[in-house]
Amino acid sequence: YFTDEFVEFYSMLQDKVKVKFEHTMDIIRTEYVLSTKFVKHLENKNLYEMRVSVNTNEYRTILFAVDNDNIILSKKVLLLNGFLKKSTKDYSKQIKIAERILKDFEL
């Protein structure tokens, strides 16, 4: 499942980046063991980050496991917002944005 914010972010990506995103989303959908190369649980949060690397660019998408606390066991995952990781400060800001989106989103 995608929020409008994620769809807007995704629509602006180059095709080669979209291919990497699709590959990572397929891994999340099909694998029972997820490497932190692709997905990482955010400390002290009920959120995860999807990690996509293209050349030297690091893209992140904040995820929420809708129907289970564990993303691997979840059948529904909501992609909240995506961004190009530039700094830790920007990263914290994006997590706050994701939390606001989740709060406003009706599950």
What feature does the model see in each segment?
Residues 1-58, 69-76, 84-107:
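Basic, Lys/Arg-enriched alpha-helical interface segments
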Residues 64-68:
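Short conserved beta-strand segments at catalytic cores or DNA/RNA-binding microdomains
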Residues 80:
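Conserved catalytic cores of phosphodiester-cleaving nucleases, focusing on short active-site segments
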